Structure formats: structure tokens, C-alpha cells
Amino acid sequence: MFQSDREFLSVITQQITNFFDKNYWTYDKKEISPTTTIFELSFMIEGHTIKMSAQIDVKRRACILVGYLPICADPVYSYPLCQLIAKENAKKLFGAIKYDERDGEITYDYAYSVANGIDEEEFEKLFHIVLKMVLDECEILKHYCNGRLNKQETNEVIDKIQKLVNDIMR
């Protein structure tokens, strides 16, 4: 369908630009490299500022929608948080929650093929799904990000950590 990577990037970039402009959404467009363009947006939803990005990956002919959870994880709690993220990801047919241990950032990423261009209805539907996932996952993960576990969760974490420590110390 596309004669070159440059044509692919140009067409997909224009299609996303048209969609955002049609919805009167403010965005930043960054050309990260000759094969990657990223659109960044922010929305105020339910009292949270939700950041989103749409990333065009020419090499994979994909659009990656990324929703940034409005919470950061304290690295001290990464062990129980990552276990919960693994459980949540196992339930998902598409997309995944990701945790960046360098800065505590948590995202929900959804990649899909745009090899034949962007279908506006599909893009809109997926964009809203990612926004909803961010809000839903925020509610599920937030108490694990700062150690606000209930008694049962606390005991489970302590038990698992104790078993790990005992095994390592052998």
C-alpha cells in the first residue's frame, strides 16, 4: 500500500493529526527519529490528569497507544506491585500494564497494526479503551504503589518475602 517508510509515516501522521484536530484536542507532536513520531496529549478526567501518547512505529507498521497512570510507585513496593501487575496482565487479551523501575512510572500500552492506514472509528474506540484502562487500573494498583495494603495483603507479601529470603540465605 505504501511505497516507502517516509510515505507511511507521513500518511499515518496526517491521519492521527486529522483525528485530534477534528476533536479539538491539543497535542504535542515529536519526531523522535526518521521512523518514529509521537503525539502527546493530556486530559482531565475524574479529577486526574491523564497523559496519553500515540506513537507511530514505522518498522513494525504499528500505532502504540500509551496511557500514563496518574500515580507513581515507590520502589520499595515494586515486589508486590509487579506481582499484581502480572496478575492484571494475565487477564488482558490485548495491551499490557508496564512498570518503569527507574522512575516508578506505570503505563498501559496497546499496540496495533496500521499497515493499511488508520481506521478512524477503530482508532477512536481504542484510544478511549486505553483511557478507560488507565482509570480502572489506577484504582486497582494505587494502594500497592505506596504500601497501603490491607492486613491480608500485608501478610501475603511478608510470607512470600520471608520464603524468598530463606531460600536466598541457604
Regions found by a protein language model. Give the residues of each.
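Charge-rich, low-complexity N-terminal segments
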Residues: 1-51
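Long, hydrophobic, amphipathic alpha-helical segments used as structural scaffolds
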Residues: 31, 96, 138-149
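Hydrophobic residues embedded in beta-strands of well-ordered beta-sheets
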Residues: 37-39, 61-63, 104-106
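Long, continuous compositionally biased terminal/linker segments
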Residues: 42-74
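Short, internal acidic amphipathic alpha-helical interface segments
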Residues: 67-105, 109
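Well-ordered alpha/beta subsegment
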Residues: 94, 99-128, 146
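Long, well-ordered alpha-helical scaffolding segments within enzyme catalytic domains
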Residues: 122-142
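Short, highly charged C-terminal tails/helix-capping segments
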Residues: 142-170
